[in-house]
Amino acid sequence: TIMSFFYVFFFGMMLSDAAYGAVVAIVCAILVKKYPRMSQSMAKSLKLFFYCGVSTLVWGVLFGGYFGNIVDIVSEKFFGHTVTVPALWFVPLNDPMKLLVYSLLFGTIHLFVGLGIKGYLCLKDGKVVDFICDVVLWFVMLIGLILMLLPSDIFASIAQTTIVFPAALNTAAKVMAAGGAIGIVLMSGRANKNPALRLALGAYDLYNVTGWLSDALSYSRLLALGLATGVIASVINQMGAMLPNNVIGVILFIVIFIVGHVLNLAINLLGAYVHTNRLQFVEFFGKFYEGGGKAFEPFKENTKYVDVKEETTL
């Protein structure tokens, strides 16, 4: 499903170490194979985390992370020359701003998919007007704003690259942003017959564009957790590398390696789990999900009039 794809995608990006991913995938596969009679919910969870482990392995290969930089440390400390396993894409520690840009890009795609699901639900229920006013107009305005942002100096300073659009595209972006904003102001309060209140509700709904900005920036946690995994792993390896090259040093190196990486894996597994859930249930679901059910009505006796009888005791 769409949700599981993004869950696995973001989980792997946050953990982003090939060795950690292999460990998670292997452990989950062994548990599923060894305990076939486990509950269905537990089996589904382990299968999900198996795919999360595979995703982590893929992201780790792309970023060149294998227990942090253990290959570099071991080759230099014990063999006298440095051997580096190159990243297939880039190393986040060397180019964090690039990872930030891609994190925001993936987050924007995730949010747009959520808005698209809202449009699908509107069309499914036959709400064509709602589809146009609550989905299409937002798409038009947001795409226009993004096209205005890309050639700006702000984006150039973050992405460390300059994008130049033709004048016609810049004009079209401004028209899309302005047209979408005007449409939202005029149509968001369409259920209200009072023109002034209708415009006020439309302006309030337009203010929700700041919510879109905060939701998009929330995906910067992909950068933060991805860097945290690699930095902590590298620190653990460096601590082991500070020991002398003798038998005791090797034994302590192995102990530090095992204990340190087990703790790092546990902490970052928890972090990836929590923050991936947050991106799904807060940012993603917030674009289309509407709670159902009925309003709570407590069990009570509803009366309009109350007769009070006064009892007198002699």
Kindly label every feature range from the protein language model.
Residues 1-314:
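Conserved, carboxylate-rich catalytic/transport cores that coordinate ions
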